[in-house]
A protein has these predicted regions:
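Post-HEXXH active-site segment of zinc metalloproteases
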Residues: 108-109, 122-157, 161
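Pan-zinc metallopeptidase signature
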Residues: 179-260
């Protein structure tokens, strides 16, 4: 099910700098959430498993089943929206899993995704947005009022943006000693720039949903791009410092304005 991945020199350098104990393995099959039996197989690789769980009351009554399962005592690795590279600290040592969907992608792009996961895993941050919002997820759900799937998408986007406020400082610092990775970070941002600039018009014309726009804008934060209103309020020290409380307040104000 899992095979150890050989890392390129730039990625190995990032691992040694940020999380030298971290393991990187390829998964045999694609997944959103790793089936529990397969997740348990990680016990053959790592020293210990430490499954996370959260209070059920953090989740609204209409919350998606996948979120309820994540909050339970079921050992859960990976969630919808996590992308092609997944990291977890529910194992000792922590581990990064690479999905086979990345096969055929440009090597430099894959290297950046791996380095990004290593940096994120090294931070003292929750593994998932539920640990970020905690009981405030119910408040976010009430503010967003887009249904379970819409709230999930907005929450994941806001958490991704908050993480980006922390990681982009590290990415920018690579210009001198990990220039290949820094170049991939800049290139990825350049590919997003035009789409981000056109977001207000795309939303106004109904070409992009507000949830999709939030996801794109928040993904641009880690690249240091200029964001249009109302997303620019998320690219601030206030959001970095006040975290989920700021995100909920932003959602409340923003969706109230959209409904006017």
């Amino acid at each position: 099910m899992f095979s150890e991945r050989t890392l390129s020199p730039p990625v190995e350098s990032a691992r040694e700098a940020y999380a030298p104990e971290l393991l990187v393995y390829d998964a045999a099959g694609d997944f959103e959430t790793l089936p529990p039996a397969q997740a348990e197989e990680l016990g053959l690789i790592v020293d210990a498993l430490d499954p996370s769980h959260y209070p059920a009351e953090w989740i609204p009554p209409t919350g998606p089943d996948v979120l309820e399962r994540y909050a339970s005592t079921t050992f859960t690795i990976g969630m919808p929206g996590d992308g092609s590279v997944v990291w977890t600290r529910q194992t000792t040592p922590p581990i990064v899993l690479v999905k086979p969907r990345l096969e055929g992608s440009p090597e430099g792009f894959v290297d950046f995704l791996l380095a990004e996961a290593i940096v994120e895993c090294s931070l003292d941050v929750p593994e998932h947005f539920l640990g970020f919002f905690e009981s405030g997820y119910r408040d976010l759900d009430a503010a967003v009022d887009l249904g379970p799937a819409g709230t999930y998408q907005i929450a994941a986007a806001l958490y991704d943006g908050w993480i980006g406020l922390h990681t982009r400082e590290e990415f920018a610092s690579w210009e001198s000693d990990r220039s290949d990775l820094a170049g991939q970070w800049r290139d990825a941002g350049a590919r997003l720039e035009g789409r981000v600039e056109s977001l207000p018009g795309a939303v106004a014309r109904g070409e992009t949903s507000f949830a999709d726009a939030t996801e794109l804008a928040c993904s641009a934060i880690k690249h240091g791009l200029d964001l249009p209103k109302p997303f620019d309020a998320l690219d601030t020290d206030a959001y970095r410092d006040h975290a989920s409380a700021f995100a909920i307040e932003w959602a409340d104000r923003t969706f109230a304005a959209l409904s006017d």
